[in-house]
Amino acid sequence: MSQQQFKYIVRLFGQDVDGTMKLPYALAMIKGIGYNTAMIIIRKLNLDKDKRLGEISDEDIKKIENLLNNKIIPESPNWIYNRQKDYESGADMHLVTSDLIFYVRNDIERERRSRSWRGVRHSLGLKVRGQRTRTTGRTGATIGVRRAKAGQPQQQAKPAGPAEGGEAKK
């Protein structure tokens, strides 16, 4: 393949992806697609996993986009989908980029409105999945330790008198 045909930047799902990366890793750069999902997509479309993203044709890029624009990956296991049993439709879907962000934001907002435990934790900005919060996840300014000024000597303790339980004069 000549140098003119190699694309160093490839536009994929409205996002610029480095064309020098191998195909599975380049697809994994897109939000909503991980390495395993990328490998399933590559197998479905009979692409070479060792090729660079900049080496594949524009038709193959369109095939990849069309496969995920349908929000389903045909003949793939249910565990590969990143949105299983959708709240409104009940279908398994695989969302990418802004669709994924939109659905997750709507889920969080629905839980806040219903005042479920998860919604309350989200609205308070706390951890949701049962993690400990005593020491980790702290936000806000830290309060340091106050130190005495270096030039001032510390006050010496006075010897206790008779009223304070000290020795009486004779």
From Swiss-Prot:
Keyword Transcription: no
Pfam families according to UniProt: Ribosomal_S13
Summary of subunit composition and partner proteins: Part of the 30S ribosomal subunit. Forms a loose heterodimer with protein S19. Forms two bridges to the 50S subunit in the 70S ribosome.
Identification of the protein by name: Small ribosomal subunit protein uS13
Family: Belongs to the universal ribosomal protein uS13 family.
Disordered, as annotated region: 132-170
Gene Ontology CC terms, in alphabetical order: cytosol; small ribosomal subunit
Composition bias, Low complexity: 133-162
Entry-linked SUPFAM superfamilies: S13-like H2TH domain
Domain of life of the organism encoding this protein: Archaea
Matching PROSITE patterns: RIBOSOMAL_S13_1, RIBOSOMAL_S13_2
Native organism: Sulfolobus acidocaldarius (strain ATCC 33909 / DSM 639 / JCM 8929 / NBRC 15157 / NCIMB 11770)
Function noted in UniProt: Located at the top of the head of the 30S subunit, it contacts several helices of the 16S rRNA. In the 70S ribosome it contacts the 23S rRNA (bridge B1a) and protein L5 of the 50S subunit (bridge B1b), connecting the 2 subunits; these bridges are implicated in subunit movement.
NCBIfam families: PRK04053.1, uS13_arch
GO term, biological process aspect, one: translation
An annotated Gene Ontology molecular function: rRNA binding
Keyword tags: Ribonucleoprotein, Ribosomal protein, RNA-binding, rRNA-binding
Cytoplasm among keywords: no
